[in-house]
Amino acid sequence: HGIFDGSQQTMPKLMQKAGYQTAIIGKWHLVSTPTGFDYYNILPAQGDYYNPNFINMDGTTTREKGYVTNIITDKAIDWMEHKRDKSKPFILFIHHKACHRAWLPELKYLREYEDKTFELPANFYDDYEGREAAKTAEMQIGKHMDIVYDTKMFTPGAKTYLTDTYLGMVGRLNSRDRAEYDFFYDSLAIDFRNRKLTGKALAEFKYQRYMRDYAKVVK
């Protein structure tokens, strides 16, 4: 994750030179300040799903109320309808945060897909024989997916490597929305702890939780 060199030639700069008005709204995630854009309103780093911050062109940061997908969409529509120079052609980059890990759904979709079982990929139990780089990469769902950060099976008092990061993300919810969020996932976490899953059963549980939340985020 280096810093993007904004001084180099880029497509937005070429579009500006050709007479286009340029804008980017949403995830930038390149550390440096956007160049070649007449307008930008971007998320810090990859941003947050709930009540996200946005970096404005004057360098200030504004916390917006709502779900990030809706906010980015609304900001894009607002720029097209009210803020651009309609005498010029334009190019607008709409960079959604979704479906970046971790997958935190809009609250109205919390219960979507909960009765759906997603088919396991044919290579789900691949042992990566003969592929040392793939075998040593910490990207296997069963072994490496964080039970709190990725599947939201939070246990009070217990910590994983990414527990604090997870709590920071959901901590952006107001008290009413947080109560709704916790009511849903806490019941799943209690059931998960009671089942004491291990091995393949645990790996497949993680996969189903991942897929259900992923589907909610992209809905």
Show where each model-derived region lies.
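Formylglycine-dependent sulfatase
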Residues: H1-K219
